[in-house]
């Protein structure tokens, strides 16, 4: 029998004698009718599962057409089939399609699958003998470490990376700026400050020639002299503005004590008096109108 129930259970290195287990068992029936010889299933080293489930006619149909079998042998074959069903409890199922039949059985002759390439797909057979699931292959991708990210999460990660890189760049730039040594302030001596103050009392602004002369006399650079005069002018303006404000406040206090008023105060008083007179006139008009209405009512 070429297509038997044990076609997938046999070992790939088995001899040609294992191809026809039923033929051997049928030959053994000539001598012994009460004992059946079955193939040793425990010694089978095949990892292939049962893929085809032929029915009673497909399993033993070929034995009916053999010319050397007799009716007595056919009776024992039916008894063998019944005993086989009672021992193994093989369910009667419709044979699956040929495409799924070949896809479920693993070939031992071929080597292990090459896992060194791109992410492989590991297929696990979930079909059992008691179910009618013809496909039964749950395919799981082999790339377990990688997880699919949503576009929002990817954008968040890229934005975070960009912000981190920008922060690191800003921090490096600030560190570079802070690492640059500041220019040391010029420490003027008392004699140099005295000469510069005397010159500033006469001239707030220096000509180029005079600046050169002062720099040579005081052993300074022209830039140092120029910067000192710039700073001194700013200080003088601040002091002058403060003095002018203080002088104006003192003058107002003196005028208040004397009883005299400033022109600004006089203008304010005049505007207030004009507003008061206008209000009084409106009040008088309203009072007259109310009195006339009362007389008319009487």
Swiss-Prot record:
Keyword S-adenosyl-L-methionine: no
Biased segments, Basic and acidic residues type: 153-165, 177-186, 284-298
GO biological process assignments: positive regulation of transcription by RNA polymerase II; regulation of transcription by RNA polymerase II; somite development
GO CC term, one of those recorded: nucleus
Record-linked CDD domains: homeodomain
Signal peptide span: none
UniProtKB keywords: Activator, Developmental protein, DNA-binding, Homeobox, Nucleus, Transcription, Transcription regulation
Polar residues biased stretches: 83-108, 166-176
Compositional bias ranges of the Low complexity kind: 109-122
Annotated function: Mesodermal transcription factor that plays a key role in somitogenesis and somitogenesis and limb muscle differentiation. Required during limb development for normal appendicular muscle formation and for the normal regulation of myogenic genes. Also acts as a negative regulator of angiogenesis.
Domain note: The polyhistidine repeat may act as a targeting signal to nuclear speckles.
Name of the molecule in the record: Homeobox protein MOX-2
Gene from which this protein is expressed: meox2
